[in-house]
A protein has these predicted regions:
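Conserved catalytic cysteine-centered active-site region
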Residues: 2-59, 65, 199-207
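Conserved active-site and cofactor/substrate-binding residues in soluble primary-metabolism enzymes
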Residues: 4, 8, 39, 43, ...
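Short coil/turn connectors at secondary-structure junctions
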Residues: 26-30, 55-60, 82-84, 92-94, ...
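Short beta-strand segments
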Residues: 60-66, 89-90, 183
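Condensing-enzyme catalytic core mediating Claisen C-C bond formation in acyl metabolism
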Residues: 74-162
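Phosphate/pyrophosphate-binding loops at sites that engage ATP/ADP/AMP, CoA/4′-phosphopantetheine
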Residues: 158-178, 196-199
Length: 207
């Protein structure tokens, strides 16, 4: 989009704080949108942490907001929903500290996408137009393959976990973890994911 949605959030907070800090109190703050399905907020978090590491006297705010909408009666319908959360990133953290070691895994797959097509108006109407010579067709409901998407997610988690082990030098890092947080499109997805990793780490048959 030409206008980042982050500017709307900034404007609302700026207006709320105007009485205390004056009008346009955020005039020297930078804002940017990062959009990438479910992981956009994580990417924004990583970028903000890098910014704060390079500028320890500054802070960053990550606002994550998303909704999932599926066709009625589709297999994805019961996973739909929406939510939002905000993080304040600081070099002097009060609640949570994030180490500078992460595992990443990426692959170009086609398990989930929102189709967008352009069709020439003359192909539809048979008549020439003096403006906007194309018709854009877009659906807000995705085309997806649920089981394939599950497998892609599982494979990336394993690859990211392996990468984290290499980066951290920790043979079994999960042994020092008290809690695990997963993106959960539906109940028990996280348990299914980590059960396989736990089995592999302990020589169990996960086939």
């Amino acid at each position: 989009a030409a206008k980042p949605t982050a500017t709307y959030a900034m404007q609302m907070v700026e207006t709320a704080l105007a009485g205390e800090f004056g009008e346009r109190c955020f005039r020297n703050c930078d804002v940017v949108d990062m959009t990438f399905a479910c992981v956009g907020a994580v990417d924004a978090l990583h970028n903000s942490m890098d910014f704060v590491r390079a500028n320890p006297n500054k802070k960053a705010i990550v606002i994550a907001s998303d909704y999932a909408k599926y066709e009625l009666a589709s297999t994805g319908e019961y996973t739909q929903g929406g939510g939002s959360v905000a993080f304040l990133i600081s070099s002097d953290a009060k609640l949570l500290e994030i180490e500078n070691k992460i595992g990443v895994a990426t692959e170009s797959v086609f398990d989930f996408f929102k189709p967008r097509r352009e069709i020439g108006k003359s192909s539809v109407t048979g008549l020439p137009e003096t403006f906007a010579d194309k018709v854009e067709i877009f659906t807000d409901e995705p085309v997806f393959d649920g089981q394939y998407s599950n497998q892609c997610y599982q494979d990336r988690i394993k690859e990211a976990y392996t990468h984290y082990k290499e980066e951290s030098g920790n043979v079994k890092p999960y042994e020092n973890w008290r809690f695990l947080i997963f993106h959960l499109p539906y109940a028990f997805h996280g348990k299914r994911l980590f059960t396989e990793i736990f089995g592999i780490e302990n020589g169990m048959n996960t086939a």
